[in-house]
């Protein structure tokens, strides 16, 4: 994925965040798909770890179930954060905002393929609001 440089929004905009902070948050959101896969694999790993722990152990003490449960909590927390912030940005446009920020989709794609029910200006207002809310919650 190439980084598309867009014109910076004015510092007077109510949802202004620094350009570098925006890119940090954008790349944070693009990991959503990986987190979903890792979260799902933790379920299988916990079941596997529970079976392994019943076997005679080696000299290395560890709690595999706790390890996978902590990973699951880590990924689950991030998944819920992005979903909650997308819902806060606009509960009606939530599914479109979520897909856009986690898959890097443009408004043009959302309009032509997914028939987003709003105009470009409204969408980008909610898109900026999403990143502003995410920035506030991650401080």
Describe the function of each predicted region.
Residues 1-88, 108:
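N-terminal interaction/assembly modules
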């Amino acid at each position: 994925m190439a980084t598309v440089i867009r014109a910076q929004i004015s510092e007077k905009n109510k949802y202004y965040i620094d350009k570098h902070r925006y890119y940090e948050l954008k790349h944070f959101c693009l990991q959503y798909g990986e987190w979903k896969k890792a979260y799902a694999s933790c379920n299988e790993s916990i079941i596997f770890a529970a079976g392994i722990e019943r076997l005679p152990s080696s000299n290395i003490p560890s709690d595999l179930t706790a390890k996978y449960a902590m990973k699951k909590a880590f990924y689950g927390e991030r998944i819920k954060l992005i979903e909650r912030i997308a819902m806060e940005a606009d509960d009606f446009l939530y599914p479109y905002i979520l897909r856009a920020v986690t898959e890097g989709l443009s408004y043009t794609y959302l309009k032509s393929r997914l028939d987003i029910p709003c105009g470009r200006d409204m969408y980008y207002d909610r898109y900026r609001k999403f990143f502003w809310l995410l920035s506030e919650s991650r401080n």
